[in-house]
Amino acid sequence: MEMVLFLVILTIAAFLLIELAYRMWSRRAKEKAGEAVPAMGITLPPVALPEFRLPGGFFYHSGHTWAHLTPSGEAQIGIDDFAQGVIGKIDRIDLPRPGTLLRQGEKAFSVVQGMKKIDFVSPVDGIVNAANDDVNADTGRIGKDPYQASWFLAVMPTNITQNIKKLRIAKDAANWLERELMVFLEFITLHRATPAEVGITMQDGGHCIEGVMEKIDGELLQLLVRKFFR
């Protein structure tokens, strides 16, 4: 039975990788031909992956955090749709106090689920002005929309001009997330995760992103964290 389940997940992952590769090739071909291609939003096969929200006006870090510049000059930061999908249920968010100095690419806050924890890096350098306590009062709101009102920290940037050079926006962000999904599927296949671990279910229309953190722990979880959230 375990061998059958393993073959099922390998087959699903193979088809998804082929589909994603075709989509990326098609996008590049259209760009070279001068055709318009959508810059935002990624719709993938509903059996396997959700449609990821990727709103415009946000700068995305490779560690799956984002920064949004406000009219006041602050940068609100939070986690992207990929991250909240992988985590699933969130019990609490450990946020730094106002006045804390953040560095781009270094730990900014932690998302906790039971005894598990993922440390997320800051997308920008800056000083914390405020922490959004509302997200801890209602962590479910992050799953509904990880952007806009679900920001975690308000930061006064100290090096935004240089920081932005290492972030992604618009079409660049959409292309990056497509590649990231391919890497994620390869990661699952490489480590031989079972359908029970990653939530792939052909019958109920599940997908291999949502709530992965709820289903794995130990070394596999640490490998996932190092691969996608640094």
Question: What residues fall within each predicted segment?
Answer:
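Contiguous, well-folded functional domains in the mature portion of proteins
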Residues: 1-230
